Amino acid sequence: MEAKAVGKHLRISARKARLVADEVRGYDYKEAIDILRFTNKAASSMIINLLNSAVANAIQMNESLDPNSLFVKKIYVDDGPIMKRFRPRARGRASRIRKRLSHITVVVSEIEKKVS
């Protein structure tokens, strides 16, 4: 069983968010939260919220599910729209500032137990 959480229009560049997302891909839920909690990046708090939301969605689908039996199956960061702002420069000119947004998707799944 899979559960998904999507964060859209998050105010961080996709390039910076991918650095953090790549750190937790494949880890189980508890370990991923521990890694993110000690990662000193702005994207880590956003990904923690999305990971908690994905786990809550999984529990919503199956009440008897243990959160510790979930792992991060997929996590990916896509580019969002770009907010364009202008900064005044010398001689009456202006420079464009591009504030980048991103969409982050987290998919959690149950750890499959091996039957022997």
From Swiss-Prot:
Gene Ontology cellular component annotations, sorted alphabetically: cytosolic large ribosomal subunit
Keyword Glycoprotein tagged: no
Keywords, ordered alphabetically: Ribonucleoprotein, Ribosomal protein, RNA-binding, rRNA-binding
One GO BP: translation
InterPro entries: Ribosomal_uL22, Ribosomal_uL22_bac/chlpt-type, Ribosomal_uL22_bac/org-type, Ribosomal_uL22_CS, Ribosomal_uL22_sf
A molecular-function term among this protein's GO annotations: rRNA binding
Keyword presence, Manganese: no
Assembly behavior: Part of the 50S ribosomal subunit.
The protein's role, per its UniProt record: This protein binds specifically to 23S rRNA; its binding is stimulated by other ribosomal proteins, e.g. L4, L17, and L20. It is important during the early stages of 50S assembly. It makes multiple contacts with different domains of the 23S rRNA in the assembled 50S subunit and ribosome.
Family named by the database record: Belongs to the universal ribosomal protein uL22 family.
Protein name per UniProt: Large ribosomal subunit protein uL22
